Structure formats: structure tokens, C-alpha cells
Amino acid sequence: SALKILAEDFTPLPVYGVVDPGAQAAAVQADASGVLVLATESTILGGAYQRALLRENPSLPVYGRACPLWVTLAEQGWVGDQATSLTQHALKHGLRGFLREAPQRSMQAPQQPKTVLLGCTHFPVFRKQIEALVGADVQVVDSAQTTAITVSDDLSKLGLLRDGPAANHEMVFLATDGVARFRKVGGYFFGGPLRNVSLVDL
């Protein structure tokens, strides 16, 4: 995988992916009803989250749902206060049939998985709307957030986590294509304009 290659190339620097932290957190929270993974089509077809979840719990029912339109909506900024009826319709469409995909037990009616894993780093911008749609009894796990927690914990263990105020901190962003677009889209996720964006050639 690309993560494995990068980890080898950048040793001893740690390289993180979002799949394992997200899967680990979802597996911990999940019950026998299983986990519904929401991600892009390529991620679902690739099966990375499904494999990672089953490594954590081989008996865990895992369901995948590709939601490619959500990425487009997020990148166009149709989120939060800018969300439209189209956004709401697309979210409902992405969750369609999700009650019917859960396992049947003793010929009883299908049950809704009680854990939803946001398997794309674009999807947290829709988290509140997704939580409202799936109901309060469903746990929504954000793979991006769990990855950030993992990185923070590791930095703390290594004594590299910054303590105290972050007034003098500086964020640097590296983009492999389209700096202007990266700034625009990134602003939706960071809640403001991005500075210090540089184009890099990999």
C-alpha cells in the first residue's frame, strides 16, 4: 500500500493513515449490530476499512456505502449554514436502505447498525446532519478525528507535543496540485482562509 511505502521511505519519521485509527475506534464502540462505513467509491471497493475492522473483530458485521456526491458537495462548500436542500437530499440518498442492510437474527426484522464510520476526511463537515438522520442511538465515528487523537497521543509519548499557548504556532500546507483550489476547499474545513500553501512535486 502507499502508506507502507511512505512509512519505509520516511523512516524513522512516523507516517499516519486514517484507516487504522478510524477502524480501531469504531470496533471499540460497535456492538453486534455492526458498523456501516461511509466513504468514497474507491475506498469502499478497495475494502481497506472492511479489512481493518475485521482485523479488530473478525465476527463484526461490516457494511460499506459509497457516497461520492458528498465529496463534491463538501468541496463546493455546501456545508453548515451554506447547506441546501440538495445537500440534505444527497445525505439521505447516501444513507438509503441502511436499515435493510443490517443482519437478520432468528428471522427477525433487520436491525440498523449502531455504529457509523465516516471513512472519508471530507465527511466530518456533514457530521451534525448525519447524526440527526441516523438518530441519537447511533454512534458516529470520525476517522479524521481519531487519527488526530492518535498523532497527539504519540507525540505526547515521545515528548514532542507542544505545551502552553499556541499563539506563535504556524501551519504549513503542502499541495500536490491546484494551490488556489486547495486554499478554497481547505478553508471550508479549517473555518477560515489558509496561508502558507506550497506546491510540491512528488
Over which residues does each language-model region extend?
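Non-catalytic structural scaffold of enzyme domains
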Residues: 1-202
